[in-house]
């Protein structure tokens, strides 16, 4: 079938970006994620609580968290909420170097941009009082109060942009701003209080969703703690200090760490963790419903392509059912991996149907990335072999690091029991097979 034009359109339908709320391509994975449902786990607490709440949401990178949060935001907008959603890693933070103040400034910026009903003067007053010490770093001269409110508000975007992109200026800005973060929280809460009074009654409850924070890279500090501990535990009082509902995403390696009970005590609830799609059971048997859901994801993306609505997965798109199954199996139930593998597969062809050889080449390409992320020098292949056999990841830093890199995946079965397995892209590697022989002999 000569399908070059439509193949390009199908390729673009698998753009690995979060789906907006209500997108027809959305697939409901709750039944194969152990019943995990953000509308219940996160949404009910926000909706029912008369006092501001602060919750944490986590999961593997690319596992579908942003899509679920966008769905939650849309749902709560129908229930009387004004929702300020932003992905902090897009414009506000550098995930390789983040401090609490960066997150606070990002929240401030997006609240100012979205909530137009409230008077920004308390926050702009804080900015005015700080501008003398910031002007040399920002390289911008502002005359207060002559400068328009819009121009003053825009300075917060410029501050977060410099913190994100300019390493030297990032350090300077933090040194100048960190002593005044409590004052900023106070000003921000004045703004929030007025917003609640001025917002229309049908949306006068306020929720901030700070996405993208789960991507913050792990950095061990001199005192033996980590930057993750510093941001989400040490600075928790500040993260919780906004007088509105807040949801922060967080690194999965911290959510599943020995600090989990501390997080529950601090935030009043355990972090909600989005598991992988269960495409096989713990004992290794394929789970048909999970595989069907992965096929549904593929079909929903293809159906959205004009002219491809009638294409059958197992006849027109893939050469046979076995080739389709291979693509799904090699993802381990990781949604973004499936989307990216589909694009990789299409790269090797100029027409449909997609051949097994193309899927194998796509798998090989992604496998190289995963293999290179395993550090043989610290015996990580041996750790992976242990998880491959036992189907559980012990709770220590070595295994949590592998979870963060998605070399180990977390699942939740129908009984609510957590289990782990290594990413299937690593299963056939020579290094893993050697490590398995070392354990079993």
Question: In which residue ranges do the predicted regions lie?
Answer:
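Alpha-helix-centered segments that form part of catalytic cores
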Residues: 22-35, 168-192, 295, 311-315
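Amphipathic alpha-helical "lid/sensor" segments that cap RecA-like P-loop NTPase cores
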Residues: 317-370
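A short acidic (Asp/Glu
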Residues: 68-70, 95-99, 217-223, 257-263, ...
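The catalytic "switch" region of P-loop NTPases
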Residues: 189, 193-320
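C-terminal leucine-rich, beta-strand-based interaction scaffolds used for sensing/assembly
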Residues: 354-441
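Walker A/P-loop-proximal flanking segment of P-loop NTPase domains
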Residues: 1-76, 80
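P-loop NTPase nucleotide-binding core
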Residues: 53-54, 59-204
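Conserved catalytic-core segments centered on acid/base and nucleophilic motifs
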Residues: 57-60, 64, 235-242, 246-248, ...
């Amino acid at each position: 079938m000569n399908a070059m034009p439509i193949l390009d359109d199908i390729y673009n339908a698998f753009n690995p970006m979060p789906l907006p709320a209500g997108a027809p391509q959305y697939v409901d994975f709750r039944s194969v994620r152990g019943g995990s449902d953000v509308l219940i786990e996160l949404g009910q607490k926000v909706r029912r609580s008369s006092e501001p709440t602060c919750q944490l949401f986590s999961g593997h990178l690319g596992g579908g968290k942003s899509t679920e949060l966008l769905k939650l935001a849309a749902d709560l907008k129908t229930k009387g909420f004004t929702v300020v959603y932003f992905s902090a890693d897009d414009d506000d933070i550098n995930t390789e170097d983040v401090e609490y103040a960066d997150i606070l400034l990002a929240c401030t910026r997006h609240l100012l941009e979205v909530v137009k009903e409230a008077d920004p003067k308390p926050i702009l007053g804080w900015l005015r009082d700080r501008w003398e010490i910031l002007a040399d770093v920002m390289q911008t001269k502002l005359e207060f109060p002559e400068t328009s409110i819009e121009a003053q508000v825009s300075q917060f975007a410029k501050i977060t942009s410099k913190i994100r992109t300019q390493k030297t200026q990032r350090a300077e800005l933090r040194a100048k701003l960190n002593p005044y973060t409590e004052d900023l929280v106070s000003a921000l809460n004045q703004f929030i209080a007025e917003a609640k009074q001025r917002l229309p009654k049908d949306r006068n409850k306020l929720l901030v969703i700070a996405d993208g924070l789960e991507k913050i890279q792990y950095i061990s500090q001199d005192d033996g703690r980590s930057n993750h501990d510093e941001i989400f535990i040490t600075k928790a009082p500040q993260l919780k200090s906004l007088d509105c509902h807040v949801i922060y995403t967080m690194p999965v390696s911290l959510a599943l760490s020995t600090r989990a009970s501390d997080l529950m005590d601090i935030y009043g609830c355990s972090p909600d963790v989005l598991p992988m799609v269960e495409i096989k059971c713990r004992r290794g048997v394929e789970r048909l419903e999970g595989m069907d859901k992965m096929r549904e994801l593929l079909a929903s993306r293809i159906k959205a392509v004009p002219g491809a609505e009638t294409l059958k997965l197992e006849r027109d798109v893939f050469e046979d059912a076995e080739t389709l199954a291979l693509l799904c199996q090699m993802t381990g139930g990781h949604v973004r991996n499936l989307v990216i593998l589909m694009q990789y597969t299409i790269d090797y062809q100029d027409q449909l149907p997609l051949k097994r050889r193309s899927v194998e080449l796509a798998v090989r390409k992604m496998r190289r990335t995963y293999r290179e992320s395993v550090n043989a020098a610290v015996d990580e292949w041996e750790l992976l072999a242990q998880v491959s056999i036992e189907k559980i990841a012990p709770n220590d830093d070595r295994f949590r690091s592998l979870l963060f890199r998605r070399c180990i995946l977390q699942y939740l079965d129908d009984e609510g029991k957590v289990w782990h397995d290594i990413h299937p892209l690593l299963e056939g590697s020579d290094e893993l097979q050697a490590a398995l022989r070392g354990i079993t002999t």
